[in-house]
């Protein structure tokens, strides 16, 4: 099955400041990134906080389609349970990200710490911003 990405086109009114989104905005701007793939647990990819929050600042945020999101959730859980990412999961994720690169993606936003070993095993050259590391800067 070919990995496919979709663009999140939803918009919501600005509901005030979100320190995490602002920290991500600053990191993405500093890295010169405008079009990114958001990867994480289901709640991160499906929820509006990061997608819509970054879109309000002019970033184009892509997320995998629902089937790929469900697969990624399972891959994260398997890597946590087994202590290392499965080779097939690493290859699948690398293909998903490579497809994003073919569609102009400039970098990755990782929304959860548990995803870092899986992405790290892909050996990618795309820049990444780890949202979970910015949590402490929310205050």
What positions do the PLM features span?
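Non-catalytic structural scaffold of enzyme domains
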Residues: 1-139
């Amino acid at each position: 099955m070919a990995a496919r990405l979709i663009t999140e086109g939803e918009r919501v009114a600005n509901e005030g400041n979100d320190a995490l989104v602002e920290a991500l905005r600053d990191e993405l701007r500093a890295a010169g990134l405008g079009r990114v793939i958001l990867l994480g647990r289901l709640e991160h990819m499906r929820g509006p906080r990061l997608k819509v929050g970054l879109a309000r600042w002019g970033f184009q945020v892509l997320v995998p389609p629902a089937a790929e999101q469900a697969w990624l959730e399972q891959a994260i859980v398997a890597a946590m349970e087994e202590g290392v990412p499965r080779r097939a999961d690493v290859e699948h994720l690398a293909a998903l990200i490579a497809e994003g690169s073919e569609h102009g993606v400039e970098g990755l936003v990782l929304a959860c710490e548990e995803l870092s070993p899986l992405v790290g095993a892909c050996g990618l050259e795309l820049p990444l911003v780890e949202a979970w590391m910015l949590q402490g800067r929310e205050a």
